[in-house]
From Swiss-Prot:
Protein localization: Secreted
UniProt GO cellular component terms: extracellular region
Sorted UniProt keywords: Calcium, Disulfide bond, Hemagglutinin, Lectin, Metal-binding, Secreted, Signal
Motif position, Galactose-binding: 119-121
Quaternary assembly: Homodimer; disulfide-linked.
Segments crossing the lipid bilayer: none
Leader sequence segment: 1-20
Family annotation (Pfam families): Lectin_C
Annotated Ca(2+) binding sites: Q119, D121, E127, N142, D143
Expression (tissue specificity): Expressed by the venom gland.
InterPro entries assigned to the protein according to its UniProt record, in alphabetical order: C-type_lectin-like, C-type_lectin-like/link_sf, C-type_lectin/snaclec_domain, C-type_lectin_CS, CTDL_fold
Protein name: C-type lectin galactose-binding isoform
Entry keyword annotation includes Calcium: yes
Amino acid sequence: MGRFLLVTLSLLVVAFSLNGANNCCCPQDWLPKNGYCYKVFKDHKSWDDAEMFCRKLKPGCHLASLHSNADAFDFSEYITDYLTGHDHVWIGLRDTEKNYIWEWTDRSRTDFLPWKKDQPDHHNNDEFCVEIVSFTGYLQWNDDSCTALRPFLCQCKH
């Protein structure tokens, strides 16, 4: 009987830990997803200042990287619920070399690029950082001047 109880209890612990693994370590006002915690910050910062702010939160934090339509829809809903204005939002994608090769600050694969029509364009040779565009429901991206002041989306590893 004791062995049965121990096995049952162990299985329950494993089941609960797996069920809550996505939510286990994120602060209350952060969005848990795929082993990361995400938060949109309303403060308006340049892209570089936003990335530095995210990095200072704790090791493993950066401006967010998005890798699928599912990510885009989840973040669209989250940002729409959180932001009251119509501000575009910085994410962690940048063309550092100014050659249309876009890279994530977390060094993850650049495998999903839902650009707004006619973007990216490096307008006036000044747009090398990426924002999620508010009037597309936060579903499409635009390149903009890295000095523009925007709210931003951070991601941190659990």
